[in-house]
Regions:
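A conserved beta-strand-loop-helix scaffold within acyl/acetyltransferase catalytic domains
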Residues: 157-207
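Conserved active-site tyrosine of GNAT-family acetyltransferases
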Residues: 99, 247, 252
């Protein structure tokens, strides 16, 4: 990876991708979960108040020399909740070793994948009754959240608070929520953040009973279309092991990665 610890431009060789803009998009998405508290500057962090690590954490600290102090601040600001520290191409080189030295353990990594939006992907065949809809209204948003939270394995009982945080995001003007709907019921989800010239694609989830039927491909193709309709140049996402082959088939290539750290249990 090409680090850009000062927030300046960092280009992935051979792809023409500005990683600084990709990570700015990802930071916007994650910081948008900071309903209880968020901070930017010496420590970019977000606290949703939800008792699940996906929605509390640290996105970066700009200085390698300040990692120890930043880790102490993160422990204080995120106390009482599970959280993750995301180490990506916008983090100073050497951050993983410093986090380990200050007691955090590595959980794993996720690839960062991108593709240009100068052409759209083929969605493939879909069930005749499957529709892609933009999510509007509190009832549909609640169903949307229930669908992806169940797929993510988030503990039950958090859906109402998650929907509240989603509805109150300060960047909702940049957000497009797309649902795969079959017979009136949401069976798949994705969220697009159209910002910093990129369509960040998040929360691509399909209900367990409808997987391996092409729904994820249809959703991702719709997300690409939404990004291009909003004038974005590239699409970017963080891929799970199960999703990476699907995204490669849609023209995405891996340009970097995020490494995830957490406090020991």
């Amino acid at each position: 990876m090409t680090p850009a610890p000062d927030g300046g431009s960092a280009t992935s060789p051979g792809h023409g991708v500005d990683l600084a803009r990709v990570t700015a998009n990802f930071r916007q998405y994650l910081l948008g979960w900071g309903a209880e508290e968020r901070g930017e500057g010496e420590l970019d962090y977000y606290r949703s108040g939800l008792a699940t690590p996906q929605f509390n954490g640290v996105v970066r600290t700009p200085s390698l020399h300040g990692v120890g102090q930043a880790a102490a601040k993160a422990r204080a600001r995120l106390a009482g909740l599970p959280w993750w520290w995301w180490v990506g191409p916008d983090s100073p080189e050497g951050t993983p070793a410093e986090l380990a030295r200050h007691g955090l353990r590595e959980m794993g990594s996720v690839p960062v994948m991108v593709r240009p939006l100068d052409r759209l992907a083929e969605a493939g065949e879909r069930a005749a009754r499957l529709r892609i809809e933009t999510v509007e209204g509190p009832e549909r948003l609640a169903e949307f959240v229930r669908t992806y939270s169940t797929s993510m394995g988030i503990p039950p009982g958090l859906e109402d608070d998650m929907a509240r945080v989603e509805a109150q995001r300060s960047d909702n003007a940049d957000v497009v929520r797309l649902a795969a709907v079959l017979d009136g019921r949401i069976i798949g989800t994705t969220v697009v953040i159209a910002a910093h010239g990129h369509a960040g694609i998040f929360l691509v989830h399909v209900s367990e009973t409808h997987r391996r039927r092409g729904v994820g491909t249809v959703l991702t193709a719709a997300a690409l279309r939404a990004g291009r309709d909003r004038g974005m140049d590239f699409a970017a996402l963080m891929a799970s092991p199960a999703g990476a082959p699907l995204y490669r088939g849609l023209g995405f290539t891996t340009v970097s990665e995020y490494r995830l750290f957490a406090l020991p249990a």
